[in-house]
Amino acid sequence: MAKATTIKEALAKWEERTGQKAGEAKEVKLYAQIPPIEKMDASLSTLVNCEKLSLSTNCIEKIANLNGLKFLRILSLGRNNIKNLNGLEAVGETLEELWISYNLIEKLKGIHVMKKLKVLYMSNNLVKDWAEFSKLGELPLLEDMVFVGNPLEERHTAEGNWLEEAVKRLPKLKKLDGNPVIKQEEEEGDES
């Protein structure tokens, strides 16, 4: 099997293809590398102006080396082999959107550091219980979330109470699984 692509190699290819310098770019796309990227290595720290970073569709197992990305607002890590959220604390003060669907995440430990997070796309992971889901309540600005395809969502959708139970735990949500959240109190208040 071919050796993995390093971040440094991927950045060199990206610079060649786009004619931009990685250290100056606001948006860097390193998705679907062939062979895939396996490690978020220290070369990421060169992306000092990056606001949107895409590393989706690779074989990354751990979130790491984000400390140099002081302006990162959107991080796309969908379709990797990520098992937990450790490593996000480095961008906890700036990250507004985390796209991390199609991974192997069971536990949401560490999510509480994401104080600016508004959008969380984490469909098709392995979250099974409400105790983990409830940790999302520690995100003060979270308003748009996709959680479809997690065992917890599948079980409660089958029982017919997913939306109600999820919104009860995350009352600030405006959108869940692509659908606007309509709150009962608001509806009743509108009629008076």
Curated annotation (Swiss-Prot):
Q: Which GO terms describe its biological process?
A: gastrulation with mouth forming second; swimming
What job does this protein perform? Part of the multisubunit axonemal ATPase complexes that generate the force for cilia motility and govern beat frequency. Component of the outer arm dynein (ODA). May be involved in a mechanosensory feedback mechanism controlling ODA activity based on external conformational cues by tethering the outer arm dynein heavy chain (DNAH5) to the microtubule within the axoneme.
Q: How does it assemble?
A: Interacts with DNAH5, a outer arm dynein heavy chain. Interacts with tubulin located within the A-tubule of the outer doublets in a ATP-independent manner.
Location(s) in or outside the cell? Cytoplasm, Cytoskeleton, Cilium axoneme
Q: Where are the LRR repeats?
A: 49-70, 71-92, 94-115, 116-137
Show the SUPFAM superfamilies listed in the entry. Answer: L domain-like
Query: Would you tell me the protein name for this molecule?
Result: Dynein axonemal light chain 1
Any one cellular component term from GO for this entry? cytoplasm
Which species is listed as the source? Xenopus tropicalis
